[in-house]
């Protein structure tokens, strides 16, 4: 479950603890589990990050297509972060199929 907080913190540059608090507040407001995709998806949408369909691409495919972007990438049961064409995670999920992803815009 730490993957959600870690990916959002890395992708947005926000402090890890601040992201935890934001997720908790969002979960309370939406009456959902802080770390479930339906819950954090609402938060990212409200912040204004465009949500895009993964179109059955792999994490690696997206990294290669977005070499100058920051992405939050959802695969089944996991959220990861790609920055400037590199996937940053504690395990290699680059071969996994993307469900949806968010383009992080400053």
PLM regions and their residue ranges:
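Catalytic Cys-His active-site segments of thiol-dependent hydrolases/isopeptidases
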Residues: 73-99
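Charged phosphate-binding loop/patch that engages nucleotide di/tri-phosphates or the phosphate backbone
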Residues: 99-106
């Amino acid at each position: 479950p730490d993957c959600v907080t870690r990916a959002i913190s890395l992708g947005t540059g926000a402090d890890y603890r601040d992201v935890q608090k934001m997720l908790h507040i969002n979960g309370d407001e939406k009456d959902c589990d802080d770390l479930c995709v339906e819950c954090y998806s609402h938060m990212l949408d409200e912040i204004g990050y465009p949500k895009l369909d993964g179109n059955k691409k792999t994490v690696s495919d997206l990294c290669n297509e977005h070499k100058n972007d920051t992405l939050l990438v959802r695969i089944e049961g996991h959220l990861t972060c790609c920055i400037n064409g590199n996937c940053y995670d504690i395990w290699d999920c680059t071969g996994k199929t993307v469900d949806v992803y968010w383009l992080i815009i400053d």
